[in-house]
Swiss-Prot record:
Gene3D superfamilies: RbsD-like domain. Disulfide bonds: none annotated. Keywords: Carbohydrate metabolism, Cytoplasm, Isomerase. The gene is rbsD. This is D-ribose pyranase.
Length: 131
């Protein structure tokens, strides 16, 4: 049995398969995941699991060189915005409009849907390299 890290076998597999510049999107409950996209639906209930905890677990195993968020998060969800800023204090944070974000996210290798129920709690993690 695995001792630590991500225990969800699908997420563990997808994270392990990420290459440099591949994108992974972590999204809220209401996000319109593209029809043909690969995704893992983690929603148990409203708020479970939440957006920030999901990011932290993925970061336990994924090297990230840049993140992309919707600029609307700063105005409409200051609490999660500030947490994202804190978590990624040493990483480039690119802000796009929500519509631009959705267009970029379509290129994600996979999506993780969380139980988050606050507006604009969506992020694209761009995979880095460990060397």
């Amino acid at each position: 049995m695995k001792k630590q890290g991500i225990f969800n076998s699908q997420i563990s597999y997808f994270v392990a398969s990420m290459g440099h510049k591949d994108m992974l999107s972590i999204v809220d409950m209401g996000y319109p995941i593209p029809k043909d996209a690969t995704f893992v639906d983690l929603v148990f209930d409203k708020g479970i699991p939440n957006f920030i905890d999901t990011i932290k677990m993925v970061l336990y195993e994924l090297e990230v060189e840049k993140v992309i968020i919707a600029g609307e998060m700063e105005v409409n969800n200051l609490k999660n915005y500030q947490k994202v800023i804190d978590i990624f204090s040493n990483i480039e944070i690119e802000k796009k409009s929500h519509e631009e974000f959705k267009d970029i996210a379509k290129n994600s290798k996979f999506f993780i849907r969380t139980g988050e129920c606050t507006p604009f709690s969506n992020i694209i993690l761009v995979s880095g390299v460990i060397f």
